[in-house]
Amino acid sequence: MSTFFKGIKKPFLVTLVLLLVCGLAYPLILTGISQVIFPKQANGSLVIVNGKAIGSALIGQDFTDGRFMKGRPSAVNYNTYIREDKDSGNYAGVGSGSKNYAPTNPELVKRVQEDIDAFLKANPSIKKEDIPTDLLTASGSGLDPHISPESAAVQILALVKSTGLSKDKLETIVKNNTQGKAFGVFGEKTVNVLKVNLDIAKELGLFNKK
């Protein structure tokens, strides 16, 4: 029996030490460092207006008001549901993801055509072939808050009409919320739709400017 306990003593101690280091000390240290150095990012990059969180700079939203810029479609409604959706079965408990339909799938063809029709109605000066692809395709997570600069640009004229703001003002707002390539090399330039709409709302006086 003593031999048995001697045999398991070392692996037991190793397991205990790794549990304390990896399961307790490491997470606590990283959490502490992140809260000190990157507090905003560590807490979800929340966008605060007048003391209230209205969203996250990392999560897209479905903007239906004609005065605001539109983002990419989402197969999971940006993980935003009401109780009626859950009761009716429209909420499947999926927080992120996409339908992963084949290009010829009738459901995908229908959804894309509906999005094209809606976009052309809201942007009558734009031709179908000029609609950037990312405005018609959902991201892999369904939560992407960004669109391409081209997708932002094609919406400017419609926003001029719906908001009363000048074209130059809207282009400046878009420019101020455009993020360059990571390290100047990786990825593409992106525009944060939530931040653009936040600045538009400020210009329209929809809440107090701070």
From Swiss-Prot:
Pfam families: KdpC (PF02669). Its main location: membrane. It comes from Clostridium kluyveri (strain ATCC 8527 / DSM 555 / NBRC 12016 / NCIMB 10680 / K1). The system is composed of three essential subunits: KdpA, KdpB and KdpC. GO terms for cellular component: plasma membrane. Keywords: ATP-binding, Cell membrane, Ion transport, Membrane, Nucleotide-binding, Potassium, Potassium transport, Transmembrane, Transmembrane helix, Transport. Part of the high-affinity ATP-driven potassium transport (or Kdp) system, which catalyzes the hydrolysis of ATP coupled with the electrogenic transport of potassium into the cytoplasm. This subunit acts as a catalytic chaperone that increases the ATP-binding affinity of the ATP-hydrolyzing subunit KdpB by the formation of a transient KdpB/KdpC/ATP ternary complex. GO terms for molecular function: ATP binding; P-type potassium transmembrane transporter activity. It comes from the Bacteria. This is Potassium-transporting ATPase KdpC subunit. Belongs to the KdpC family. It is a single-pass membrane protein. It is found in: Cell membrane. The chain crosses the membrane at residues 13-33.
